[in-house]
């Protein structure tokens, strides 16, 4: 870095991509072991190594950006493009689930009784917990925008308050979704309705947990004065991701809960 004459970040060799890949392998293998052999040892090992990798990789990035100043405006521009492309890939990921749902529901086969929901399936009432979940996520979208505007204006206390409210709403959403799953009158093995419902809403729930983790990291970073009104891409990326999760839920609610029931 001593004689560098450009604005790009020359990254040092890092073990975290390798440990992250290995922990992902352990987690997926552990899930298979849990499903088929009722053993959670490999899954717990995978989750532990994944959490350790996340912590150490995040720590290194914070060190490089906040304390060493490697994240120049040029580097931040590249990171913005990267986050946008990542969110586009996630949109395509969820498009596959919506495709599966509409493929099955718009032309139900005789095996399903020629109707949707299939014969024998009692769908959830869209005006009960799902509607509450929708209002919770919409409220969290408002509070994350409040946090972002407070940060832009240099209002640290309001930013922390708004971010805390967003995290609390995200956790509340996850708890509501868990209770809904627990009380649902159908399971993932109840044909195409159960599988499309639980895979689509389950992956969305996973994204809410990931987004909440992202926001919790931002909360602790803000407590340590890591963000300024002009240098806060970590928070901006988390806010974009949260808005994406919000919009996907609206499509899920309208398609699967409301129209699909």
From Swiss-Prot:
Molecular function GO labels: cytochrome-c oxidase activity
Reactions mediated catalytically: 4 Fe(II)-[cytochrome c] + O2 + 8 H(+)(in) = 4 Fe(III)-[cytochrome c] + 2 H2O + 4 H(+)(out)
InterPro entries: Cyt_c/ubiquinol_Oxase_su3, Cyt_c_oxase_su3_dom, Cyt_c_oxidase-like_su3, Cyt_c_oxidase_su3-like_sf, Cyt_c_oxidase_su3_a-hlx
GO biological processes: mitochondrial electron transport, cytochrome c to oxygen; respiratory chain complex IV assembly
EC number: 7.1.1.9
SUPFAM superfamilies registered for this protein in UniProt: Cytochrome c oxidase subunit III-like (SSF81452)
Keywords associated with the record: Membrane, Mitochondrion, Mitochondrion inner membrane, Translocase, Transmembrane, Transmembrane helix
Primary subcellular site in the record, as a coarse category: mitochondrion
Record topological domains on the Mitochondrial intermembrane side: 35-40, 106-128, 184-190, 257-261
Domain of life of the native organism: Eukaryota
RNA-binding is among the record's keywords: no
One cellular component term from this protein's GO annotations in UniProt: respiratory chain complex IV
Subcellular location: Mitochondrion inner membrane
Membrane-topology annotation of the record: Multi-pass membrane protein
Residues in the Mitochondrial matrix compartment per record: 1-15, 67-72, 153-155, 224-232
Transmembrane segments: 16-34, 41-66, 73-105, 129-152, 156-183, 191-223, 233-256
S-S bonds: none
PANTHER family recorded: CYTOCHROME C OXIDASE SUBUNIT 3, CYTOCHROME C OXIDASE SUBUNIT III
Family: Belongs to the cytochrome c oxidase subunit 3 family.
Assembly and binders: Component of the cytochrome c oxidase (complex IV, CIV), a multisubunit enzyme composed of 14 subunits. The complex is composed of a catalytic core of 3 subunits MT-CO1, MT-CO2 and MT-CO3, encoded in the mitochondrial DNA, and 11 supernumerary subunits COX4I, COX5A, COX5B, COX6A, COX6B, COX6C, COX7A, COX7B, COX7C, COX8 and NDUFA4, which are encoded in the nuclear genome.
Functional summary from the UniProt entry: Component of the cytochrome c oxidase, the last enzyme in the mitochondrial electron transport chain which drives oxidative phosphorylation. The respiratory chain contains 3 multisubunit complexes succinate dehydrogenase (complex II, CII), ubiquinol-cytochrome c oxidoreductase (cytochrome b-c1 complex, complex III, CIII) and cytochrome c oxidase (complex IV, CIV), that cooperate to transfer electrons derived from NADH and succinate to molecular oxygen, creating an electrochemical gradient over the inner membrane that drives transmembrane transport and the ATP synthase.
Protein name: Cytochrome c oxidase subunit 3
């Amino acid at each position: 870095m001593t004689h560098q004459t450009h604005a790009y970040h020359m990254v040092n060799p890092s073990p975290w991509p390798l440990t992250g890949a290995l922990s992902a392998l352990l987690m997926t293998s552990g899930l298979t072991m849990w499903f088929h052999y009722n053993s959670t040892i490999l899954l717990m090992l995978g989750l532990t190594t994944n959490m350790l990798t996340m912590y150490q990789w995040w720590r290194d990035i914070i060190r490089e950006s906040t304390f060493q100043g490697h994240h120049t405006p040029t580097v931040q521009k590249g990171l913005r493009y990267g986050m946008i492309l990542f969110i586009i890939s996630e949109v395509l990921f969820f498009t596959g689930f919506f495709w599966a749902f509409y493929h099955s529901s718009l032309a139900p086969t005789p095996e399903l009784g020629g109707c949707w929901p299939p014969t024998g399936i009692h769908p959830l009432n869209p005006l009960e917990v799902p509607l509450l979940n929708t209002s919770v996520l919409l409220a969290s979208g408002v509070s994350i925008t409040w946090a972002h505007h407070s940060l832009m204006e240099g209002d640290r206390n309001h930013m922390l308050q708004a971010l805390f409210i967003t995290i609390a709403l995200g956790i509340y959403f996850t708890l509501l979704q868990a209770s809904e799953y627990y009380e649902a009158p159908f399971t993932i093995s109840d044909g195409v309705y159960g599988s499309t419902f639980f895979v689509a809403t389950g992956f969305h729930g996973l994204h809410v947990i990931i987004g909440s983790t992202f926001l919790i990291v931002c909360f602790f970073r803000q407590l340590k004065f890591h963000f300024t009104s002009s240098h806060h891409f970590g928070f901006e990326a988390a806010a974009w991701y949260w808005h994406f999760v919000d919009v996907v839920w609206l499509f899920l609610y309208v398609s699967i809960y409301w129209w699909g029931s």
